Amino acid sequence: MVSWMICRLVVLIFGMLYPAYASYKAVKSKNIREYVRWMMYWIVFAIFMAAETFTDIFISWFPFYYEFKMAFVLWLLSPYTKGASLLYRKFVHPSLSRHEKEIDACIVQAKERSYETMLSFGKRSLNIAASAAVQAATKSQGALAGRLRSFSMQDLRSIPDTPVPTYQDPLYLEDQVPRRRPPIGYRPGGLQGSDTEDECWSDNEIVPQPPVRPREKPLGRSQSLRVVKRKPLTREGTSRSLKVRTRKKAMPSDMDS
């Protein structure tokens, strides 16, 4: 476990970070020699990383595996050994130049097939999504229609058959039309004779209605606070005594005459 951690740190620092900074310096200085050197290093290191993916799975149990890997990375990077340039010139460049046309043809075919597969996959995914949306919409519509039908049937069954009772407000009896009793011999829905057609309503046939009370206007705030002044009542005894006195005064005048 310790060797694995040390190996990962060595590969990260000496295999990636330092070569990346050195490549930046080569591009900035426009030194063709350094540029070619670091390009060869990155090609060899990419092949090493691809091979490491499989060797870590199958050969990691081999003793001193991580120590050999650290030593190999340092050998590639060292300016004294120049392991990256040596491997590139001896093995990588000849093999790539030998199979260059085949590699290019495979890349072109892979591009075309990947484009076609992406189009077909996109069409299939769109068709599947559209069919799923249509099925979901139909199912939801059917479920909603069934639910609405069940609710409507329940509502219709819950409506009572009894007529709604009418109520009369005793405060507004004058607004209502007085009802009259039908004449004697009247049959609802039947034909009336010639004698019954000429009959008129009599006064005693009208249903007596209670007397209508005039609506009293509500008192205002100022009127409710006023004090009602009443006139003093005149006594009947005083008026009669005045009449007797006038008669007594009138009698001596008659005697003198």
UniProtKB/Swiss-Prot annotation:
Chain ranges passing through the membrane: 1-21, 42-62
Region annotation (Disordered) ranges: 177-257
Keywords: Cell cycle, Cell division, Endoplasmic reticulum, Membrane, Microtubule, Mitosis, Phosphoprotein, Transmembrane, Transmembrane helix
Topological category with respect to the lipid bilayer: Multi-pass membrane protein
InterPro entries with a match to the protein in the record: TB2_DP1_HVA22
Residues bearing the modification Phosphothreonine: T196
Keyword Transmembrane: yes
Modified-residue entries (Phosphoserine), positions: S152, S194, S202, S253
Domain of life, per lineage: Eukaryota
Family to which the UniProt record says this protein belongs: Belongs to the DP1 family.
Full protein name: Receptor expression-enhancing protein 4
Organism of this sequence: Mus musculus
